[in-house]
């Protein structure tokens, strides 16, 4: 859940790559089986174990429909870093997989009315949790504090430091698309939850 940075919309309990897409016919067949076998089961889109909010997952799912635009934005960002004044140790410390994980996190949860200082601090704290949960570069039992400090500093550089202008220039089109199409996904998600066989479950008002 914290090691694979391919598509974070799938990185949740019960998620798997085979669920990326399906056909209309297969979806209806699945719904009919569900109605026969478990007519009173819960239709959950969020639980206490969910790693991301429903709306963030709905936004990130859009990346699967715009891989070229996403790849272009990411490569532009990496190119801008190569020509920036970012301290070299930060670039050496932050591996590409962690970097991609955080980029998706940032654009998926991008706030409507951005208080970037607060947002940068929240993402920096979350970044430390991510690498500890991944247990590759750090962990809860044996934290690599130097790496974590570099990671948090890099996040703040990207969102409210010298890199912020470059970041928004690279990712503004992607964020705009995720916001618009993610809203459609969110509404569709709620519609399916309340109309498909089963009992809709709304976790903490979601």
PLM regions and their residue ranges:
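Catalytic cores of glycan-processing enzymes that make or break glycosidic bonds
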Residues: 1-206
């Amino acid at each position: 859940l914290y090691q694979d940075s391919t598509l974070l919309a799938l990185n949740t309990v019960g998620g798997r790559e085979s669920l990326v897409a399906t056909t209309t016919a297969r979806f209806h067949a699945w719904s009919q089986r569900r109605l026969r076998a478990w007519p009173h089961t819960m239709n959950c889109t969020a639980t206490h174990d969910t790693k991301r909010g429903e709306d963030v997952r709905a936004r990130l799912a859009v990346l699967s429909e715009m891989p070229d635009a996403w790849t272009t934005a990411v490569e532009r960002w990496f190119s801008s870093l190569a020509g920036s004044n970012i301290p070299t140790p930060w670039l050496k410390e932050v591996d590409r997989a962690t970097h991609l994980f955080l980029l998706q996190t940032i654009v998926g949860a991008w706030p409507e009315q951005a208080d970037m200082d607060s947002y940068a601090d929240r993402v920096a704290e979350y970044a430390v949790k991510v690498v500890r949960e991944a247990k590759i570069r750090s962990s809860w039992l044996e934290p690599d504090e130097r790496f974590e400090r570099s990671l948090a500093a890099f996040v703040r550089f990207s969102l409210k430091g010298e890199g912020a202008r470059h970041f928004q220039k690279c990712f503004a089109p992607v964020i705009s698309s995720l916001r618009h199409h993610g809203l459609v996904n969110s509404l569709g998600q709620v519609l399916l939850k309340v109309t498909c066989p089963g009992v809709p479950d709304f976790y903490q008002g979601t």
